[in-house]
């Protein structure tokens, strides 16, 4: 394994300071994250990039699938410190490198050196003001047939206090996300709403009652008691709407 923090690269990138405490509450949602990865897995290659890797919760699940290489990109200084430390602990498991940067700033270097065939954005694209430029950068970094994997929050009418607190720029609809991927030069292979059961609780808590935080205890409870059943139900009947959208698209 090689772990390569690219300190020289980020000097030309605006420094981002974000501890990620609220978002990392989702690190307790193990079943939820495994569900996402299971839906991605049939389309994934072996040379992977995860953008907005945070402190590495989803990255660790990716490594269970023994990829040929994994490149982890995280712009937050605080979160990157934890991510890089964890990556060093994964030394015997895979070829892992880290970048403390936004993806467009390292896209060319990562494309040339790491030759990724799959680039993953889990709960990241909604934070990026110019998401269309981001998708174009991903498209340029991938070879023909390379794929982008996107998981984002759905429906602007669910946008509430938590979204504002964690700096979500937007929530998406499937047609909107599909159109943006198509405009960037991708062909959509899979696009589904995800977690139908989470829609009503989310609306009540964050829109109606105006809460702005996510409690780890409730995340664990939902993950253990609800997610396994919702996962089975949505495998049988694709939901007409959901709290999130999962999309896979291929560079044509």
For each predicted feature, which ranges?
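Feature marks short, surface-exposed loop/turn motifs that line or immediately flank catalytic pockets
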Residues: 57, 79, 156-158, 197
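Short, glycine-/aromatic-enriched active-site segment of Class I SAM-dependent methyltransferases
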Residues: 21, 148-170, 174-182, 204
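Conserved S-adenosyl-L-methionine
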Residues: 186-197
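Conserved N-terminal segment of class I S-adenosyl-L-methionine
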Residues: 1-122, 133-135, 240-245
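A short glycine-rich, Lys/Arg-flanked "PGG" loop and its adjoining helix->strand segment in the class I
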Residues: 132-147
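A C-terminal cap/extension of S-adenosyl-L-methionine-dependent methyltransferases
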Residues: 6, 12, 27, 109-112, ...
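Residues lining the SAM
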Residues: 122-125, 151
């Amino acid at each position: 394994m090689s772990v390569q923090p690219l300190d020289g690269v980020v000097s030309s990138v605006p420094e981002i300071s974000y501890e990620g405490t609220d978002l990392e509450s989702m690190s307790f949602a193990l079943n939820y994250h495994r569900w996402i990865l299971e839906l991605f897995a049939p389309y994934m290659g072996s040379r992977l990039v995860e953008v907005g890797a945070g402190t590495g919760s989803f990255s660790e699940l990716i490594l269970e699938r023994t990829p040929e290489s994994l490149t982890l990109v995280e712009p937050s200084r605080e979160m990157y410190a934890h991510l890089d430390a964890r990556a060093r602990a994964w030394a015997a498991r895979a070829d892992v490198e880290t970048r403390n940067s936004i993806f467009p700033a390292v896209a060319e270097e990562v494309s040339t050196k790491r030759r990724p065939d799959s680039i993953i954005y889990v709960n990241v694209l909604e934070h990026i003001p110019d998401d269309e430029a981001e998708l174009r950068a991903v498209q340029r970094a991938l070879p023909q047939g390379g794929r982008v994997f996107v998981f984002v929050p759905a429906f602007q009418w669910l946008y509430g206090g938590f979204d504002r607190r964690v700096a979500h720029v937007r929530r998406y609809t499937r047609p909107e996300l599909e159109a943006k991927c198509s405009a960037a030069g991708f062909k959509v292979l899979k696009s589904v709403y995800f977690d139908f059961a989470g829609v009503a609780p989310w609306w009540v808590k964050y829109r109606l009652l105006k809460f702005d935080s996510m409690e780890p205890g409730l995340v664990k409870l939902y993950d253990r008691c609800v997610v396994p059943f919702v996962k089975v139900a949505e495998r049988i009947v694709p939901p007409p709407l959901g709290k999130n959208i999962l999309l896979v698209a291929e560079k044509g």
